[in-house]
Amino acid sequence: MPAYVFSKESFLKFLEGHLEDDVVVVVSSDVTDFCKKLSESMVGEKEYCFAEFAFPADIFDADEDEIDEMMKYAIVFVEKEKLSEAGRNAIR
């Protein structure tokens, strides 16, 4: 489960690289569930934050498998002071 920590400038470049002319962005602020738990990863067992988001299904003309493939990133806007040392060191 890779996670990236971007500076503002790097995040804008990241967005530009993913936003082709016909791409729109769906944003939901409806977090329906959240928990922290240990999970296996490529680097061993690590604590992760799990969040469940909800958005209206009627905005898509796609089946569940197609929508699942569309879900690529979760984005958290956070002030630098709320990052741990590891988070600050990971800023690109």
From Swiss-Prot:
SUPFAM superfamilies: AF2331-like. Pfam families: AF2331-like. InterPro entries: AF2331-like_dom (IPR028986), AF2331-like_sf (IPR036842). This is Uncharacterized protein AF_2331. It comes from Archaeoglobus fulgidus (strain ATCC 49558 / DSM 4304 / JCM 9628 / NBRC 100126 / VC-16).
